[in-house]
């Protein structure tokens, strides 16, 4: 790890990742980190990140290089051999500058292997050409010509010295050419290849070696004969004329390559002695695995007194198995002592392998030999057969007695059925347990005759077996109790499984029903939401249309306001919201007619519809007095605003009492200024006459249409009621109507803001402010 102070310094060892202190071992580093840097919790995350990065880099490096990147020594193994310590918990050493030579190594290795293989193949091919003809019966000149045709020889003048030993060539030190590569060497460096070795290398099997080998052609015999001939010769010419027709001259390098090839062939075809012995050992073990189970079955049957197997055959099989065990022991001992007396002692790994084979064979013999059962003698086998025969007879007797006892109990039960009473109760058999006898069967009594059967057959079976268990316990039949308890457990498990499946099926059906209901509810909500949106859009459009129409009609109908004042209840019926009409049927009272803002109720709320005129006409007492049935222009029609409504929106006449007029502020002054001399109420000093009080003089407006209910006698005029009683009724209803009107106008303001109609927002805001002022004044006025 590089130090922070000196970037060029490289430090190695067990360094602390925080203080860079060099510790001597892994455990010292761990203890130092736990003691000194225990409080540095923030560094833990950084260390984990570094460890993860190093691990990724290591995995990438190992993935790229594979198994070829192996560090020498056993330090890597020892660092992982400590149990309970994870080296990845600590920060590893930083990977220094490195360079992979794997590609170069593979390239050089492939070239070297190719060179070796190609060269060896060339030598074998040339050797095969040199041995393809009969060298003993061919002339020397022809042999020399054939050898030169196989490989070109190097020129003698080009090589003055021997390439191997460096001696100078002369008359005594002649030049010799290698018949396989064509190079030149001296006689000392020359090698000879015998024909047997040549045929062995060129042939596909060793049979060629025995075919071409003879005592006269062996290398030792030939060499010895040549040596004798050389010793017998005294002249130099005889040495120069020496013929080696039965052998092939070659250099040391070619001879070494051919010898390595021969060694590879021998190793490939040779089987070591330990392998042969181990194969025999495995065959013996497999034979024991086949014979031992068969012998165990035979011994168990014979010891039980059965006559299925023959005693003599079992004895023969036992002897055979024992002999195989002895052979296994002998082979394992031979493997253990193999090669111990040889001069070059075997490799320690070979000796260890031999010891483990011996140990494995010993364990095998002990395990199998201890499992062998002894066979009875002939006398013992006869006694066992007699004893088994007696047991079988006794068993048959017991079974016959059990059958007779069960038949007797069945007859008793059938006879006991006749003693039943009228209501079906059993008196003779109930409550009296059967006597317990030795060597007899037992049969439980059914207790479900006087009880209603359960619709579920499993429950009925459980009840019956429970009753049988009680009877078996009372009778002391432990075997039957265990059997019945096992049957009861199985029935209970089956019943529990059945109930679980039913519960799962029921829950699944309920879930499907809930899902269907949820989908239907969502569909209904979606439809309701769409309907509300449509109504909201329609109401918004109607509100905007009415406000715009009102703003356009008000200037043109100001003059018409001086005409006859139609009863305010008409405009109330025309512009009142359906909430007021539906919730208060008696809202058309004299007190409600004087409501100041009832004339401007705005459009209907969301999800509501305006009542048609036919519905409003049905609420009147007399159908003949319905003003909506006539075509008089003075009567207001649907979608038009009456003069009384305009007058009520702009401000009531001056004759109305001041404390009950919510629009007597600036709106009245603006109206007086606009009307001028044509307005009968232009005189501010004179008291404003009340248009609702009857006057003896003629009215300035045109007479009302015949049949108008607003021109009836004073006794039926709702505006001529007693002032005290009218104020009391008006005060309670006005407050409720004003609050409802305030809520409606707030909703209209919200809708106008959402739609971006700021002109309507200003108008509605002014109306809302006036309504609030009126409500405050009415609450503060004395009763």
Swiss-Prot record:
It is a lipid-anchor. Residues 99-262 are annotated as: Necessary for the correct targeting to endosomes. Residues 263-499 are annotated as: Necessary for interaction with RAB4A. It holds the Pfam family NPF. Residues 387-399, 405-414 have a biased composition (Basic and acidic residues). Residues 206-240, 387-433, 569-638, 663-733 are annotated as: Disordered. PANTHER family: FYVE-FINGER-CONTAINING RAB5 EFFECTOR PROTEIN RABENOSYN-5-RELATED, RABENOSYN-5. Interacts with EHD1, RAB4A, RAB5A, RAB22A, RAB24 and VPS45. Binds simultaneously to RAB4A and RAB5A in vitro. Interacts with RAB4A and RAB5A that has been activated by GTP binding. This is Rabenosyn-5. It comes from Mus musculus (Mouse). The lineage of its organism: Eukaryota, Metazoa, Chordata, Craniata, Vertebrata. The gene is Rbsn.
């Amino acid at each position: 790890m590089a130090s922070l102070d000196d970037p060029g310094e490289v430090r190695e060892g067990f360094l602390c990742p925080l203080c860079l202190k060099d510790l001597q071992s892994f455990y010292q580093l761990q203890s130092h980190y736990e003691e000194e840097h225990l409080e540095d919790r923030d560094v833990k995350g950084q260390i984990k990140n570094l460890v993860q990065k190093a691990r990724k880099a290591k995995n990438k490096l190992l993935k790229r290089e594979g198994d070829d990147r192996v560090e020498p020594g056993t330090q890597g193994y020892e660092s992982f051999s400590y149990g309970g310590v994870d080296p990845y918990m600590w920060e590893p050493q930083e990977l220094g500058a490195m360079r992979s030579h794997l590609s170069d190594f593979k390239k050089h290795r492939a070239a070297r292997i190719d060179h070796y293989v190609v060269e060896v193949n060339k030598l074998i091919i040339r050797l095969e050409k040199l041995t393809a003809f009969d060298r003993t019966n061919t002339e020397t000149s022809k042999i020399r010509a054939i050898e030169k045709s196989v490989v070109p020889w190097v020129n003698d003048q080009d090589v003055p010295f021997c390439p191997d030993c460096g001696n100078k060539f002369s008359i005594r030190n002649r030049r010799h050419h290698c018949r396989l590569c064509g190079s030149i060497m001296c006689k000392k460096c020359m090698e000879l290849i015998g024909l047997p070795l040549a045929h062995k290398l060129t042939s596909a099997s060793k049979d060629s070696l025995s075919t071409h080998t003879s005592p006269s052609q062996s290398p030792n015999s030939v060499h010895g004969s040549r040596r004798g001939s050389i010793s017998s010769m005294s002249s130099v010419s005889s040495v120069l004329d020496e013929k080696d027709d039965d052998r092939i001259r070659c250099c040391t390098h070619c001879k070494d390559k051919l010898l390595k090839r021969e060694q590879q062939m021998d190793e490939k075809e040779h089987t070591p002695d330990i392998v042969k012995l181990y194969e025999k050992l495995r065959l013996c073990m497999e034979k024991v695995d086949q014979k031992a189970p068969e012998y165990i079955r035979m011994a168990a049957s014979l010891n039980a007194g059965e006559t299925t197997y023959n005693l003599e055959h079992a004895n023969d099989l036992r002897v055979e198995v024992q002999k195989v065990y002895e052979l296994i022991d002998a082979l394992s001992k031979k493997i253990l002592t193999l090669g111990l007396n040889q001069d070059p002692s075997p490799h320690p790994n070979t000796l260890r392998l031999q010891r483990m084979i011996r140990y494995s064979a010993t364990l095998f013999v002990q395990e199998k030999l201890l499992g062998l059962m002894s066979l009875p003698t002939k006398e013992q086998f006869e006694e066992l057969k007699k004893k088994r025969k007696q047991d079988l007879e006794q068993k048959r007797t017991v079974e016959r007695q059990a059958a007779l006892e069960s038949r007797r109990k069945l007859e008793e039960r059938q006879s006991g059925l006749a003693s039943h009473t009228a209501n079906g109760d059993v008196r003779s058999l109930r409550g009296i347990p059967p006597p317990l006898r030795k060597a007899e069967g037992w049969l439980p009594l059914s207790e479900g005759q006087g009880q209603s059967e359960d619709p579920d057959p499993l429950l009925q079976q459980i009840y019956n077996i429970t009753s049988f268990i009680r009877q078996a316990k009372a009778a002391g039949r432990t075997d039957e109790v265990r059997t019945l308890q096992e049957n009861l457990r199985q029935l209970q498990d089956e019943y529990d499984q059945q109930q679980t499946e039913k519960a799962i099926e029921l829950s699944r059906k309920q879930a499907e029903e809930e899902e269907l209901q949820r989908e239907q509810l969502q569909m209904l909500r979606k439809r309701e939401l769409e309907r509300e949106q449509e109504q909201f859009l329609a109401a918004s459009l109607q509100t905007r249309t009415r406000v715009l129409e009102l703003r356009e009609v008000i200037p043109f109908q100001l003059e018409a306001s001086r005409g006859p004042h139609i009863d305010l209840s008409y405009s109330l019926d025309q512009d009142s919201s359906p909430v007021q009409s539906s919730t208060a049927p008696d809202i058309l009272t004299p007190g409600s007619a004087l409501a100041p803002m009832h004339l401007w109720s705005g459009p209907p709320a969301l999800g509501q519809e305006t009542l048609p005129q036919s519905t409003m006409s049905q609420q009147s007492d007399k159908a003949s007095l319905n003003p909506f049935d006539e075509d008089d222009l003075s009567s207001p029609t649907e979608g038009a605003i009456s003069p009384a409504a305009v007058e009520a929106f702009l401000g009531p006449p001056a004759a109305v009492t001041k404390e009950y007029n919510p629009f007597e502020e600036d709106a009245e002054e603006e109206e007086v200024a606009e009307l001028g001399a044509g307005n009968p109420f232009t005189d501010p000093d004179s008291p404003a006459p009340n248009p609702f009080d009857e006057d003896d003089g003629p009215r300035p407006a045109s007479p009302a249409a015949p049949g108008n209910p607003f021109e009836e006698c004073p006794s039926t005029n709702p505006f001529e009621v007693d002032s005290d009683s009218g104020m009391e009724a008006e005060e309670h209803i006005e407050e409720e109507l004003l609050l409802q009107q305030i809520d409606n106008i707030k909703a209209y303001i919200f809708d106008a803001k959402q739609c971006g109609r700021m002109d309507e927002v200003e108008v509605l805001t002014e109306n809302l402010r006036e309504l609030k002022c009126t409500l405050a004044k009415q609450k503060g006025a004395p009763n």
